[in-house]
C-alpha cells in the first residue's frame, strides 16, 4: 500500500545514492532486506553461489542464516551450505595484512578469486558477494583502502552481484559518508 510519504522518503533516500541506483524497495527489517537481496542476486544471475565474509551476520531468517558464518558456525549452527563460500575477513588489526601494508586491500580481495573457484569446483556459479561495508559483528572493522572496490570488480567479472549490507553501518552512521561503500569508492567499479 503506497502512501505519498513513502514516495517522499524514497526520493530522499535516492538523493543520497550514486546516480545509477534508482530504485527503492521498502521492507520491515534488515533480515528481510538481505533476504530480498539474495533473491535478486539469484534471479539476476541465474546462479546460486554466494561469497560471504568470515564472522558475518546478515539476519535471522533461514536464508540470511545460510549466509551468516556468525550463525551457521556458532552454537546450534549446521555449518555453511554447499553453495556458500567464506572469504577471509579484511581485518587490518587482527588479520594477516596490517595497517602498515599499503596493498592490504588488494591482498584480502584476492581471496575472493579463491572463493569463486571453490564454488565453481562444487558446481555453483556465482550469484553474488554480500558484506557489511564496515563489518560490525566482525568487530567494527574499517577495511583497508581499496578492498571493496577490488572485490566488487572481481565479483562483477565473474557475473555476480555486489550486495552492501548497510543495515548497521549505513544511513549516515559513519560520519564522512552516508553509505559505507562510498568510503571504499565501491559503488561502481
Feature roles, as predicted:
Residues 1-189:
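Conserved N-terminal phosphate-binding loop of PLP-dependent enzymes in the Aspartate aminotransferase
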Amino acid at each position: 500500500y503506497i502512501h505519498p510519504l513513502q514516495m517522499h522518503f524514497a526520493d530522499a533516500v535516492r538523493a543520497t545514492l550514486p546516480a545509477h541506483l534508482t530504485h527503492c524497495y521498502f521492507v520491515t527489517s534488515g533480515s528481510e532486506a538481505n533476504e530480498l537481496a539474495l533473491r535478486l542476486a539469484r534471479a539476476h544471475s541465474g546462479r546460486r553461489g554466494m561469497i560471504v565474509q568470515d564472522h558475518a551476520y546478515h539476519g535471522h531468517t533461514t536464508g540470511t542464516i545460510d549466509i551468516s558464518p556468525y550463525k551457521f558456525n556458532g552454537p546450534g549452527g549446521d555449518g555453511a551450505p554447499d553453495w556458500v563460500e567464506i572469504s577471509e575477513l579484511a581485518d587490518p588489526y587482527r588479520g594477516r595484512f596490517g595497517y602498515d601494508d599499503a596493498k592490504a586491500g588488494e591482498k584480502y580481495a584476492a581471496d575472493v578469486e579463491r572463493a569463486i573457484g571453490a564454488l565453481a569446483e562444487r558446481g555453483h556459479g556465482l550469484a553474488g558477494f554480500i558484506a557489511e561495508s564496515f563489518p560490525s559483528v566482525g568487530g567494527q572493522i574499517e577495511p583497508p583502502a581499496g578492498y571493496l572496490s577490488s572485490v566488487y570488480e572481481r565479483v562483477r567479472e565473474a557475473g555476480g552481484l555486489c550486495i552492501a549490507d548497510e543495515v548497521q553501518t549505513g544511513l549516515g552512521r559513519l560520519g564522512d559518508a552516508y553509505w559505507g561503500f562510498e568510503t571504499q569508492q565501491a559503488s561502481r567499479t
